Amino acid sequence: MMQDLEILDIVDESDCVIGQKKRSEIYSQGLCNFRVVNSFVVNSLGKLWIPRRSAQKRIFPLCLDVSMGGHVESGETYEDALQRELEEELNLDLNMVNTQLLGYLTPYKYQVSAFMKVYEIRLDYEPDYNQNDFIESFWLYPSELIEWLNKGEPAKSDLIKLVQMFYAN
């Protein structure tokens, strides 16, 4: 959906909906009180499937990203958004993959970009990803990914924090 048309719920510190705004307004105002979902695809070797965002992305173009991420649109639950984004970005059906919730994070407690639920999807093959969203991908151990990021590989802002939180030993 085009950013100018996408309406997101605005939430209070308890993640209760208090209003709505256009996605473009949220970003132009630097707000963090909206909802997102993020997922990591992990194979049986413990490697993360990490894609690189396309050059057409308005935010973080050509940066490494979580395996799947997206905004929770107004009126959706986190789980609704997970299902929609899995289909849009990775051509996966939520009911056909092994998914587990890794955690629920808030910007006030964890200094992340938004209220978020982070999931893990177990797959031993590369997803059939949407090539409008991503241009390439890598299977990396968490330690390899952290090393890349520490050496300056461009990445979406929350990526290193999420990998360290959920996958660093």
From Swiss-Prot:
Keywords: Hydrolase, Magnesium, Metal-binding, Plasmid. The keyword Metal-binding applies. It comes from the Bacteria. Mg(2+) binds at E85, E89. A motif (Nudix box) lies at residues 69-91. Pfam families: NUDIX. This is Uncharacterized Nudix hydrolase all7351. GO terms for molecular function: hydrolase activity; metal ion binding. Belongs to the Nudix hydrolase family. InterPro entries: NUDIX_hydrolase-like_dom_sf, NUDIX_hydrolase_CS, NUDIX_hydrolase_dom. It comes from Nostoc sp. (strain PCC 7120 / SAG 25.82 / UTEX 2576). Its cofactor is Mg(2+). It is an enzyme of class 3 (hydrolase). PROSITE patterns: NUDIX (PS51462), NUDIX_BOX (PS00893). Its EC number is 3.6.-.-. The keyword Methyltransferase does not apply. Residues 32-162 form the Nudix hydrolase domain.
